[in-house]
Amino acid sequence: MNNYENMKSAVRSSRHRTIVKKQEDYRRYVTLKNGRKVLDHDSEEAGKNAGVSSGIYKGFAGAPAYLDISYNELLKRAEENLSALVSEPEENNESFCEERVDHTCENDTTEMESVVKKIDEYIDKIAKGEAERELSLISFYTGKEWLKSSGKGGEEDSLVTFLMITLGAKDKDGNSIDVERLTGWRGPAVNAYKIKNLKPFLRQTVQMLSDKKDSVPVVPGNKDIILSCRMTGLLVHEAIGHTAEADNIYSGSVAGKLLGKKICGEDINITDFANHYNGKELVVPIYYDDEGNEARDVEIVKAGVFNDIMTDSYTAGRFGRTPSGNARAACYHDQPLVRMRNTAMLPGTKEIDRIVESVEDGYFIVDGVSGQSDLSGTFIMVPSAVYEIKNGKIGKAVEPCRITGNCFDVLKSVSDISNRFDWYVGICAKEQEVVVSSGAPDIRCRLNIGKA
């Protein structure tokens, strides 16, 4: 009996609403330092799990593949866990009607070393041998097969490749400087050759390092700031998206008090997209989440109003909503949590050059790889590339700094939104690591900036 038949036999024998899943996760890391390979490591986790639900309550059990535990046994364990929450779990009244939804891809990591070597050689050439280089190519593959007691199920595979670049040098005074950047794409490493903007990205990275050799100190204060598409996307994810996750709202996120209220200008719209944007499939396409709920777009901010939240089955029940398809689990042994998928602020109409010209004294924050926020929407981000803006022109690079603020105050302060828009892929580490993407335009706003 194949895996699907085993799953079908298990869910049909259960008296409760169930979902069973088989999952494989594979990671490979290849790192070069100044052209020499210093790491080539892979890891794999495989197993299966079962979930049983009664109303808003869930029982869960998982086991690694090497134990060869049956789905029936996992369902029994999940039912025992559910009974600790509900004395008399509801019986399933769904009729079993088979419907498969498959979205598959191949796990191909064969060319990772050759790809990262070619990228390293290109960087070394344009940097004229004057940059210390560390490049890591990271492959994230996940393959899932799942089935619900309703008969709906399928296979969903995803493969995303990340490129992490760290370049180092000495500034004019002999101090160490560096630039750290992250990019990524859907599919295997060889897809790097298909990305039109990869070489411009690499050239820009080398230029950022060169600019830092003659950088100037930041002037601390609340300033006019232009956030690039990449940095606006990071802000949207860290400071706005997390506050709109229903489990965080249940834990006290300020967004719970703002739902249905106007929080910013009508030209601001923020959506967590399930799988497509403007007719194109996204880097992290989610059609059904890890609870088997159909994924839909969530319009978090609509015309300046805090409009909707991201939910799983439990929080949807608590808030009287339909699950949005945001329940995601990193590995077979993880219970699904409310997670973002492809979160974006929609573009405006103004040219970025006109926005820069409108700033008399401020900063252009071009790139950064991480940030943190709390449930009040207060955040901190440490950029990797910042430039002065003086009299409407971009000036010198700025020494290491950080930006802080509250996302809702920042949204209120937005005075311009550019018409250019781009997507960026990354890793979200909310309890479990999952791949996400963020999309955004450039924005002009007010932010606190200070020394790092």
Q: Predicted regions: what is each one?
A:
Residues 1-452:
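N-terminal small-residue-enriched
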